[in-house]
């Protein structure tokens, strides 16, 4: 296990992902006062496949931003005119190429977060949504709930989000979200 105090993130993968990241296991950590808890990040043009990531038994306290974030628009660097946050959904979505980042097969369990700005933020790409993410047996106490964009095959199994502001869960272009 590990203890992370007052850093940018407790556990971070990215943003330069051209070689990808595979088969990573993180267990038994404490993140106290970090900017984010778990963060995986990339953007168009960096490519790479991030897959088979296992994270379990994580305690977070006083996270300044998101407890758990996957962001494929990292650093607000979307490609203009590609149906991203700065354009219309009617604009053409770019084709998938070797420069398109891909995040899939992520297995997260036994997360406890006592205090964060937002519990969960998933922000995939229209042309490459986040795919096959399982979050199990977790509790998030935060100001804001969860926001999911461009994601598919998501399982929240025994996930409790206790937020003091806004909706518990906001979805935009999410396919096959199961809550048990």
Language-model regions: role of each:
Residues 1-180:
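Extracellular/periplasmic carbohydrate-active domains that bind, remodel
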């Amino acid at each position: 296990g590990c203890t992370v105090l007052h850093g940018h993130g407790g556990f971070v993968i990215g943003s330069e992902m051209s070689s990808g990241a595979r088969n990573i296991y993180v267990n038994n950590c404490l993140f106290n006062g970090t900017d984010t808890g778990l963060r995986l990040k990339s953007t168009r043009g960096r490519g790479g496949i991030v897959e088979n990531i296992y994270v379990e038994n994580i305690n977070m306290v006083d996270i300044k931003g998101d407890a758990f974030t996957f962001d494929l628009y990292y650093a607000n660097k979307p490609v203009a005119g590609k149906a991203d946050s700065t354009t219309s959904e009617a604009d053409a979505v770019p084709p998938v190429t070797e420069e398109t980042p891909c995040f899939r097969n992520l297995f997260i369990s036994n997360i406890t977060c006592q205090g964060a700005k937002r519990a969960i933020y998933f922000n995939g790409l229209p042309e490459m949504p986040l795919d096959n993410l399982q979050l199990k047996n977790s509790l998030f106490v935060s100001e804001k709930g969860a926001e999911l964009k461009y994601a598919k095959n998501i399982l929240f199994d025994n996930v409790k989000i206790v937020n003091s502001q806004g909706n518990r869960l906001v979805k935009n272009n999410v396919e096959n979200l199961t809550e048990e």
